[in-house]
């Protein structure tokens, strides 16, 4: 083959558009998409793992999971709730009749 024919058979590749000197929009889109995916991954990690890990670590400090308070206020153990019995029932009061009461 002569060089002139081989030049005609090669595919023509378009030249790139001139850059405007700023950040390309494809790069901005790529960063936005990766940030969004990273945020979703962090949220799912918290939802599935970190929340339970926080509860386990708080329970190991001597608190039960019912007493957990996220903040500064601590649980007051000096005044426990008394274990009172329910008042005795007065028998079957019967059906509720409006206006008799």
Swiss-Prot record:
<feature type="region of interest" description="Disordered">
    <location>
        <begin position="1"/>
        <end position="22"/>
    </location>
</feature>
<dbReference type="InterPro" id="IPR002621">
    <property type="entry name" value="Gemini_mov"/>
</dbReference>
<comment type="function">
    <text>Involved in the viral transport within, and between cells.</text>
</comment>
<keyword id="KW-0916">Viral movement protein</keyword>
<comment type="subunit">
    <text>Interacts with the capsid protein (CP). Part of a MP-CP-viral DNA complex.</text>
</comment>
<feature type="region of interest" description="Disordered">
    <location>
        <begin position="79"/>
        <end position="101"/>
    </location>
</feature>
<keyword id="KW-1133">Transmembrane helix</keyword>
<dbReference type="GO" id="GO:0016020">
    <property type="term" value="C:membrane"/>
</dbReference>
<dbReference type="Pfam" id="PF01708">
    <property type="entry name" value="Gemini_mov"/>
</dbReference>
<dbReference type="GO" id="GO:0033644">
    <property type="term" value="C:host cell membrane"/>
</dbReference>
<comment type="similarity">
    <text>Belongs to the mastrevirus movement protein family.</text>
</comment>
<keyword id="KW-0813">Transport</keyword>
<feature type="compositionally biased region" description="Polar residues">
    <location>
        <begin position="80"/>
        <end position="92"/>
    </location>
</feature>
<feature type="transmembrane region" description="Helical">
    <location>
        <begin position="30"/>
        <end position="50"/>
    </location>
</feature>
<dbReference type="GO" id="GO:0046740">
    <property type="term" value="P:transport of virus in host, cell to cell"/>
</dbReference>
<keyword id="KW-0472">Membrane</keyword>
<keyword id="KW-0812">Transmembrane</keyword>
<protein>
    <recommendedName>
        <fullName>Movement protein</fullName>
    </recommendedName>
</protein>
<keyword id="KW-1043">Host membrane</keyword>
